[in-house]
Amino acid sequence: MGKTLAEKILSEKSGSDARAGDIVIAKTDFTFMHCTTGPLAVRQFQSSGFERLADARKVAVFLDHAAPTPNAEMANDHLFLRSFADKTGCLMHRVGDGICHQLVAESFASPGDVVLGADSHTTTGGALGAFSTGMGSSDIAIACALGKTWLRVP
């Protein structure tokens, strides 16, 4: 029997013969966070002792969910994320650039890619033939640092 699209992509990205139910370590092509999930991901990144991204060109921060910021706490989160982007060199999408999952679909996700986002709409990239899934902030932090993640093949 043939493979599903997810099995094909995750086989390629893990260097294994991935089948549904398998747990694989897969290379990532793009990882992103936004202004409500990003602060937790960045704090996890920092508390894990990471200082550098695996590839800054493959990581993005989007200031899109609380824009303009409704309170001082969110304004401070925006500053915190901008500082992280400045220090690491990751891509930074500012207020007004657009909503993360739409921009990822338009500019960053391609067929055969593994795309991870700290956003429930990350699966939008699947329409382009990418394996695109949402993850929690801790997993996003690790993927940013290592350029890979563990996944159970669907």
Please tell me what each predicted stretch does:
Residues 1-154:
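Fe-S-dependent hydro-lyases/dehydratases of central metabolism
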